[in-house]
């Protein structure tokens, strides 16, 4: 096996064994030692709690006002019927909720196959028993199915609904997760000469609405998205300090000696208390010509030297001189 000793192996989806229509075993290998339990536990928790799915949330049964009652001609009490309805495995396509209806008469079992629905809904377990009728009795109900995630108890939804909720509309504890059971096992794996690797085997039982491979892919995507915040830590730095733009061009803060003028011109400027280039550029030609011993030749020299630095006489500088120069004087 080639590669750096610090390079981590990347697992691959090795096998999906379909044990029965609702149970499958998914195998991933090779994994670095210890990563079998690390990933197995994380994926197990996500698969149990975070897979989106559909569940029954409300039921209305003709002739029934509340869940703590029974219905004549029905073998089960209402609470047991609601519990059975929670076992429906439903898939909704293209929308977030659907209304199903169930009407049945005559003695015998009432199953999910007796439920009528539109083409956007598929019931994956039509053999699922809802209740049993006795004699020549009938039952009719309307069932609301919604898409969601996790577990939402009926009591939590009751607190958010208005007090005018119709009598007879029964709320159901909604378990949206399509994963009924999940377990994992870590076995030994080998790649060429390395025998200290892990093989992760995930044993998953669903309600038949979720493909095992798709379930693993969704769980891994959720895990990766949650970890992105840690990956992006390298991009989180202290707020960038904005560089304060200097109030004056640095060249204006330099002494006039840096202009390397002739001795005559330099002495004339010093006699007028012109110590910095910023002092000089604010003077006009007329003002400089009034300076003793500074003639047109010196003026021309000064203008040429300033021009070579992108400056000129007669410039206006707000707030000149800066405090730092005043302190130095």
Swiss-Prot record:
The lineage of its organism: Bacteria, Pseudomonadati, Pseudomonadota, Gammaproteobacteria, Alteromonadales. NCBIfam families: PRK05182.1-2 (NF003513), PRK05182.2-5 (NF003519), rpoA (TIGR02027). Keywords: DNA-directed RNA polymerase, Nucleotidyltransferase, Transcription, Transferase. GO terms for biological process: DNA-templated transcription. GO terms for molecular function: DNA binding; DNA-directed RNA polymerase activity; protein dimerization activity. This is DNA-directed RNA polymerase subunit alpha. GO terms for cellular component: cytoplasm; DNA-directed RNA polymerase complex. Residues 1-234 are annotated as: Alpha N-terminal domain (alpha-NTD). It comes from Shewanella violacea (strain JCM 10179 / CIP 106290 / LMG 19151 / DSS12). SMART domains: RPOLD (SM00662).
